[in-house]
Amino acid sequence: MPCPRLLAALFCSSGLFAASGDFCDSSLCLHGGTCLLNEDRTPPFYCLCPEGFTGLLCNETEHGPCFPNPCHNDAECQVTDDSHRGDVFIQYICKCPLGYVGIHCETTCTSPLGMQTGAIADSQISASSMHLGFMGLQRWAPELARLHQTGIVNAWTSGNYDKNPWIQVNLMRKMWVTGVVTQGASRAGSAEYLKTFKVAYSTDGRQFQFIQVAGRSGDKIFIGNVNNSGLKINLFDTPLETQYVRLVPIICHRGCTLRFELLGCELNGCTEPLGLKDNTIPNKQITASSYYKTWGLSAFSWFPYYARLDNQGKFNAWTAQTNSASEWLQIDLGSQKRVTGIITQGARDFGHIQYVAAYRVAYGDDGVTWTEYKDPGASESKIFPGNMDNNSHKKNIFETPFQARFVRIQPVAWHNRITLRVELLGC
């Protein structure tokens, strides 16, 4: 077959293709491009180029807002117009994979938000109804709907005559919510659980909208559990920026009985534990104004470095020597970090419940000069609400995060003795 004229003729004369005229025999396409025949046209072939390359032979680097891909974690970069985005990153958006958020999908966002640990308080959980069992003495109340809750009455169950049941959580501020983990329970010896459910959300607690099916109209129906004890994880196609999350049972096995956890992260995306619980921060970097010895015995000391969230053992927290507002616990982060929040926890001393009920936070870079945290526009340092028992987590997020190496916690109110286990959040 004679060579086509012009460009194809150049390839002919250069001997880059077989005598039979099959232009794809010589693998003309560069950078892993795929050669496809384009018979009866000029040129008689074309190259299907991999991402990032263009040109007749995939010999040119593709340019544009998505090349190279600015998105992280294998997110898809989508070219758009300036009117689609209101921020400085014009011409593209990043479509995040499940469990990631951020302008560039840079933040992993699947942390438990506090149902299981108690960081979400009982008062933040409400429902359309609840079941009253055993002559009204058993309250299957919404505040029991915590993942892995134990006991004879250990979950939320809707009322017998509730035709449109729901349970909701008020997160107290806008957060990213990326998924939910559900679990059933056993009631009167029988397994009960949600087989399917919907998820609604709201920013004001009054007007709710349901998560929709991706790419189609209609409310999304999530698949729930198949027994009373197993866990079912559902991640949302699109993260929710919301304050209220409502689970609406659709099909229930025997009764609408639920334990659950919400997954997500703070909007600022900088809420990773800074190293107290996992011992990344060494003992020598955790100090205090004093520490208590039960019965005055050194063997029964409540050292500062015991003040790690969820620490276990007979002596598993820091306790101050005196109940005085002059006492403090100090953490040296080792280098300057962005600190966005704190989680506190109390402990027991031979059966006596002890915790810090309120405290201030101070910070600095040299361990000598301190700045007490204040809310924006406030003239007085902020007093943070602390714990109400010895074991639950209490999370406080700083409205204005700060940069610091040293963080000091200053108790101002306590129950029995000043006792703390703690984790700092940030990045």
UniProtKB/Swiss-Prot annotation:
Disulfide pairings: C24-C35, C29-C47, C49-C58, C66-C77, C71-C94, C96-C105, C109-C265, C252-C256, C270-C427
Residues bearing carbohydrate: S27, T34, N59, N227
UniProt domain EGF-like: residue ranges: 20-59, 62-106
GO biological process, any: single fertilization
Keywords from the named record: Angiogenesis, Cell adhesion, Cytoplasmic vesicle, Disulfide bond, EGF-like domain, Fertilization, Glycoprotein, Membrane, Repeat, Secreted, Signal
Matching InterPro entries: EGF-like_dom, FA58C, Galactose-bd-like_sf, Neuropilin_MCO_CoagFactor
Mode of membrane association: Peripheral membrane protein
Tissue specificity of this protein: Milk and spermatozoan. Also present in epididymis, kidney, heart, lymphatic gland and spleen but not esophagus, small intestine, muscle and liver.
SUPFAM superfamilies: EGF/Laminin, Galactose-binding domain-like
Transmembrane regions: none
Principal place of residence: membrane
Subcellular location(s) per record: Membrane; Secreted; Cytoplasmic vesicle, Secretory vesicle, Acrosome membrane
PTM comment, free text: The two O-linked glycans consist of Gal, GlcNAc and Fuc, with probably Fuc as reducing terminal sugar.
Signal peptide per UniProt: 1-18
GO cellular component entries: acrosomal membrane; extracellular region
Protein task: Contributes to phagocytic removal of apoptotic cells in many tissues. Plays an important role in the maintenance of intestinal epithelial homeostasis and the promotion of mucosal healing. Promotes VEGF-dependent neovascularization. Specific ligand for the alpha-v/beta-3 and alpha-v/beta-5 receptors. Also binds to phosphatidylserine-enriched cell surfaces in a receptor-independent manner. Zona pellucida-binding protein which may play a role in gamete interaction.
PANTHER family linked to this entry: F5/8 TYPE C DOMAIN-CONTAINING PROTEIN, MILK FAT GLOBULE EGF AND FACTOR V_VIII DOMAIN CONTAINING
Domain notes: The F5/8 type C 2 domain mediates high-affinity binding to phosphatidylserine-containing membranes.
Name listed for the protein in its UniProt record: Lactadherin
Taxonomic source organism: Bos taurus
Organism placement in taxonomy: Eukaryota, Metazoa, Chordata, Craniata, Vertebrata
